[in-house]
């Protein structure tokens, strides 16, 4: 069976190709899965990927535990492939990144209001699945992220029962800190982040 990787990549002047596809399909673009590995987590094996391909990027990169949809964002993984995280549009025997399609076609794909405000497609969805819990971490608001020259990262989660027939090893999520936690306590944990047990879980709802 031919692989998406075997398709010819179109890297520029994609507007006519994309608009013809949108016209032929009634406004739909077919996107190939974007598989993302994480070196610090164990895959949960429930994202519709054959188990033999779980470590397709190599053991040093970690197992694939995420499948991104409609993504124009590259991963922040160390040692990543140049197009890691990017969704590819599949048109006949050709492929091009959704990011390139949006850059060339703008509001035709994302709509006038989003194109005017962001000049890009600023969000994506994903299957996210691990065997055990993920590390304690935070997501900055837009105002917080702006202080360090970044964008905010709001997220929402949905756990469809048809994709979660088993709970794996630790099917729980803890959010926030224990009442009474001070900013100085959190800062001290961050200072000790690479010193073994930094104590952050002592402050969390875990």
Name each region found by the language model.
Residues 2-183:
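Transition-metal
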Residues 194-206:
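Loop-centered beta-sheet repeat module
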């Amino acid at each position: 069976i031919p692989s998406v990787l075997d398709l010819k990549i179109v890297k520029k002047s994609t507007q006519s190709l994309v608009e013809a596809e949108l016209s032929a399909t009634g406004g739909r673009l077919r996107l190939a899965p974007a598989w993302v590995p994480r070196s610090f987590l164990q895959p949960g094996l429930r994202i519709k990927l054959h188990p033999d391909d779980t470590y397709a990027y190599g053991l040093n990169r970690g197992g694939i535990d995420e499948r991104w949809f409609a993504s124009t964002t590259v991963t922040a993984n160390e040692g990543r492939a140049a197009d890691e995280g990017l969704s590819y549009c599949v048109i006949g025997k050709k492929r091009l990144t959704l990011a390139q399609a949006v850059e060339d076609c703008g509001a035709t794909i994302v709509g006038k209001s989003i194109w005017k405000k962001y000049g890009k497609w600023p969000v994506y969805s994903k299957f996210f699945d691990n065997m055990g819990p993920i590390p304690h971490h935070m997501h900055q608001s837009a105002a917080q992220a702006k202080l360090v020259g970044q964008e905010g990262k709001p997220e929402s989660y949905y756990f469809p029962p048809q994709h979660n027939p088993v709970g794996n090893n630790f099917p729980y999520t803890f959010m926030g800190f224990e009442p009474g936690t001070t900013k100085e306590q959190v800062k001290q944990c961050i200072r000790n982040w690479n010193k073994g047990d930094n104590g952050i879980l002592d402050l969390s709802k875990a």
